[in-house]
From Swiss-Prot:
It comes from Chlamydomonas reinhardtii. Keywords: Chloroplast, Membrane, Plastid, Sulfate transport, Transit peptide, Transmembrane, Transmembrane helix, Transport. The gene is SULP2. Residues 1-21 are annotated as: Disordered. This is Sulfate permease 2, chloroplastic. It is found in: Plastid, Chloroplast membrane. Part of the chloroplast sulfate permease holocomplex. May form a heterodimer with SLUP1.
Length: 369
């Protein structure tokens, strides 16, 4: 029988198939751990590994093949909880992982932490709601119905609607390429991803204004095409994209670095292209981290102030977001309108936190399965 060359030696398959047996390998009885259902065969058919991802049972060169025993790896929920920044501290609600507060030193430290959080976070947050409804709900609703208020809300939602999907796609592609490939300048490129974290948003707005303004590098090109960047929605979107760029990619890189690649390699062995591997294998493994990064990106996009303030010019009724509306109304001593906008921003923040909690609970629940 003619020998067949197999193209996946990394999977533990032989490079030649000889006449002695279909794979020239001795059959070693062992328990198949790839599927939850009991198997009637005493040999592990590793096509079951791919059955759950490609939706069908397949074989290599028309024959079943023995899969390598996969390396131990964390579950997707554990990776999200342990590797995804703030999720590490929030993902185990009521998990019972801490020690009981059983002495006065621990009680004192807990009390100091609770008092600090209450004074710095909770009291100012609640005071905004108290001030917004101090004169009743009717004045609050009147301010919310103001045309300038509604336009600011519209601009805020539009910025989030544009920047979050773009940074989600970029962050996913960048994270996969940075973790799956080695190339010159990789370390420098990964360092650049953290640049928006270290630069003041006001400086970001100034940089974009100098670059796309009337005397900037692209001034002539922008004049010829009739595109306005400074004091326009385009510039606001660019500024928001810059400050929110690292969130998705930085959430995904630790998960991808700790993910076992055996399933991706097996899928390619069975003929899956890059898109099928991503959609059926990679994406299910990173979905919790991806969703968490999207939530953080959205929260920052809706609350951005400094960069948007510089490049937009804070033009009322044109380039004003809710955060800029709060500043303008407060400076004009229209405190009730400022408090109304602050309450709406706080409500959006609470909604984001609620979604984040649900994501963390779902990830933690899956990790316990």
């Amino acid at each position: 029988m003619a020998s067949t060359t197999l193209l996946q030696p990394a999977l533990g398959l032989p490079s030649r198939v000889g006449p002695r047996s279909p794979l020239s390998l001795p059959k070693i009885p062992r328990v198949c751990t790839h599927t939850s259902a009991p198997s009637t065969s005493k040999y592990c058919d590793s096509s079951s590994v791919i059955e759950s991802t490609l939706g069908r049972q397949t074989s290599v060169a028309g024959r079943p093949w023995l899969a390598p025993r996969p390396a131990p790896q964390q579950s997707r929920g554990d990776l999200l909880v342990s590797k995804s920044g703030a999720a590490g501290g929030m993902g185990a609600h009521g998990g019972g992982l801490g020690e009981p507060v059983d002495n006065w030193i621990k009680k004192l430290l807990v009390g100091v932490a609770a008092a600090y959080i209450g004074l710095v976070v909770l009291v100012p947050f609640l005071n905004v709601f108290v001030q917004a409804f101090a004169k009743g709900i009717i004045p609050f609703l009147e301010h919310c119905a103001d045309p300038d208020f509604l336009h600011a809300l519209k601009m805020t939602l539009m910025l989030a609607f544009v920047t979050v999907p773009l940074n989600t796609v970029f962050g996913t592609v960048a994270a996969i390429n940075l973790t799956r490939n080695e190339f010159p300048g990789k370390v420098f490129l990964m360092s650049l991803l953290d640049l928006p974290f270290s630069i003041s948003p006001v400086v970001t707005g100034l940089m974009l204004t100098l670059l796309y303004g009337r005397t900037g590098w692209f001034a002539a090109l922008l004049r010829e095409t009739g595109i306005n960047v400074v004091f326009a929605f385009t510039g606001m979107a660019l500024a928001t994209m810059f400050v929110t760029l690292p969130f998705v990619v930085r959430e995904l890189i630790p998960i991808l670095e700790n993910m076992d690649l055996s399933q991706e390699e097996a899928a390619r062995t069975l003929g899956a292209n890059d898109w099928q591997v991503f959609w059926n294998v990679t994406l299910p493994n990173i979905r919790w981290g991806l969703l968490y990064g999207v939530i953080l990106c959205n929260a920052r996009a809706m609350g951005e102030f400094g960069a948007v303030s510089v490049i937009s010019g804070n033009i009322i009724g044109r380039t004003q977001t809710l955060t800029l509306f709060v500043e303008s109304a407060y400076k004009e001593y229209n405190t009730e309108a400022a408090f109304a906008a602050a309450v709406l921003l706080s409500a959006l923040a609470l909604g984001t936190l609620w979604i984040k909690d649900k994501v963390e609970e779902a990830a933690a629940a899956e990790s316990r399965k």
